[in-house]
């Protein structure tokens, strides 16, 4: 049975290694025929203000993850705080607010996903 993993990234640009590992692991899980979803929570929506820039050093990694459809949701409350709502929309990413403005864990748990947080 293929693994199902939901990775909740909470770290913003002040902790780049967490974003890098989230994206590397997501691509690795997909490559190994697992199902993976990345969720941007906490400070992570701030990445949407810098990663879409082709001159950013990690733009290529971000673009691979985005093009693969692995970014499942962006927390709406956190995107509002980060002033990243427009950036999420421009990137075609889904803003979710089903748990008091944040992304609920329950749809992922009910679908059999393991939850990983960074």
Language model: regions and residue ranges:
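Histidine-anchored nucleotide/phosphate-binding helix
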Residues: 18-33
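Structural beta-sheet core signal
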Residues: 7, 38-40, 74
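A glycine-rich helix N-cap at a beta->alpha junction
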Residues: 54-84
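C-terminal structural segments of small proteins and small subunits
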Residues: 87-111, 116
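Residues at the starts of beta-strands that form the adenosine-phosphate
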Residues: 4, 34-37, 71
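Short, glycine-rich nucleotide/cofactor-binding loops
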Residues: 6-20, 45-53
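Glycine-rich phosphate/diphosphate-binding loops that line cofactor/substrate pockets in enzymes
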Residues: 1-4, 30-32, 109
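Short, glycine-/small-residue-enriched flexible loop/hinge segments at domain edges that mediate gating
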Residues: 33-50
